[in-house]
């Protein structure tokens, strides 16, 4: 109870004086109609602006904001442009030249190397081709870590696409190669000697091959249709295939819009053995879903009502299980004061397909012995308020109640000296997945402020209360707070900083040895932590920019996962070069 009061007090302190919360980035607060009158030749530069400073985001560094990844696709400008009205003559600043391509290289302590290359080329007025290469690696060197804590992550993506008046499409081919080490030995609980440590083979390699496509028909009932095939495997005999396709169709009748979404999602794979060395673990899940809905937009009110119907067929070690799920799909919003203040609410559910690849993306230190099963997200009921307090201040506040069956939790694997499995992940230095039913009460607030065209500030906070059926909500924090600041100091110099706080989390540890009178079973509380990062950059000219990036400035050797301390104070010095062919 005292800890909960402290969390609520912390949130109140951060938001006091700010007097408002921020608008969520992915929420729209209004629409406009434009008339398209003439085509033009698309360029990649019209679609986005190159980042001057790369982001180092890795399990052995720091915990960053959650990012959702989609099928790799290069942004390309539309082949149409809206008509431009003639404005009164005003003094204008010269626009910064935009480039289609860039290369970035950064080098830092811990033997860190960060490299990126992005290129694109228009083949005609409509067709384009592009490619991206990314590399992030570190030689490690975290204090008091007994095993190798180096890592590398290299990815290559190629895309080809076309945009016309009638149809947009693109196809993507990607490959990723990652290497990590299970370096988190439970030395606090187990007295490892040098011979035992030297006998551990702690490295793990992941490889991913993806083939994706996206189709968008401009006219007719068919909407955007994404599809993806992913082949994922590791160096310990694990392999997994994933395929999904999600077409959608809609049509309008007067003020009503009827929409139907279809989902076909398959995942199947196998592990060479389980945690105790028993060979051959296999699984497959095939989910089919249809989500019909009707949308009504009238004056300041928007209501979308529908339902999701899903069928799931699972086969685990030759045992078959068939299930049917029904979910609410209801969303509504009302403009209380035009686009300045909007109230919204909803009740949504979904069948979430879990996979080995997704678990590895979230936690690189899982063992290749996981139980894979989908999560039944029964409902997420929410209500919120968003909008603007002024032209420079936007806010969003939201409360929700969510119920999930078979929610996946990461928890530390046990260490048993009598385990016949001797792979490098069985020494209490890896993580498994357990499933439990979870109910979550969540309060979220966000504030975005542009003090001027050169200064932008944002702050957000989330408080969660968890209720489970069987055990703890393992490795889920009750409190998360983050803030960021970006400043254009001069035309040449820019800088930024961000800080985030993550509250306590709980995990469990089990150790058994013939020398013990009884096994050691312990619930461990991972301490809360904060992380402060900053960067500064200098634009030498329109093409060349130098940057300095500082991570974990306070040198907090916190544990993101049990027994896995992160790297301390990190420095990355580099440059970004933009160019056209």
Where are these regions (language model features)?
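N-terminal periplasmic/intermembrane-space "pro-region" immediately following the signal or transit peptide
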Residues: 22-93
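Outer-membrane beta-barrel translocator/receptor signature
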Residues: 83-85, 94-103, 107-144, 148-154
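Exposed, low-structure sequence patches enriched in small/polar residues
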Residues: 98, 103-106, 302-581
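Membrane-embedded beta-strands of outer-membrane beta-barrel proteins
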Residues: 117, 156-158, 211-215, 243-247, ...
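Surface-exposed extracellular loop regions of Gram-negative outer-membrane beta-barrel proteins
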Residues: 121-143, 261, 283-315, 450-465, ...
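Flexible loop and strand-edge segments within Gram-negative outer membrane beta-barrel domains
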Residues: 138-151, 155, 172-224, 228-242
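Outer-membrane beta-barrel transmembrane domain signature of Gram-negative proteins
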Residues: 203-212, 228-300, 432
